[in-house]
C-alpha cells in the first residue's frame, strides 16, 4: 500500500476539546475502533500528528 496509511481510532473524542473532534471527523474517524485508509500527504500527516495520542497508525 504505497502512498496510503491505515489509521484506527483507539480513544474516544467524547469530553475532548472541539478542535480534536473536528480533526477526527476530518479524518473520517467517527466511532471507536474504526479504521480508515487515507492517502499519505503532508496535510493528513499533520492532522494525525494533532490527534496522535488518540489513534494508531500503520504504514
From Swiss-Prot:
GO cellular component, one term: cytosolic large ribosomal subunit
Gene3D superfamilies: Ribosomal protein L30, ferredoxin-like fold domain
Gene Ontology MF: a single term: structural constituent of ribosome
InterPro entries reported for this sequence: Ribo_uL30_ferredoxin-like_sf, Ribosomal_uL30_bac-type, Ribosomal_uL30_ferredoxin-like
Source species, domain of life: Bacteria
Keyword Ribonucleoprotein: yes
Any Pfam family hit: Ribosomal_L30
Alphabetically ordered keywords of this record: Ribonucleoprotein, Ribosomal protein
UniProt GO BP: translation
Keyword Ribosomal protein: yes
HAMAP family for this protein: Ribosomal_uL30_B (MF_01371_B)
Family in the record: Belongs to the universal ribosomal protein uL30 family.
Subunit structure: Part of the 50S ribosomal subunit.
NCBIfam families (UniProt xref): rpmD_bact
Name of the featured protein: Large ribosomal subunit protein uL30
Amino acid at each position: 500500500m504505497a502512498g496510503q496509511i491505515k489509521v484506527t481510532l483507539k480513544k474516544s473524542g467524547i469530553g475532548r476539546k472541539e478542535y480534536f473532534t473536528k480533526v477526527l471527523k476530518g479524518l473520517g474517524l467517527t466511532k471507536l475502533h474504526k479504521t480508515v485508509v487515507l492517502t499519505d500527504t503532508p496535510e493528513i500527516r499533520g492532522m494525525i500528528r494533532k490527534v496522535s495520542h488518540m489513534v494508531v497508525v500503520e504504514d
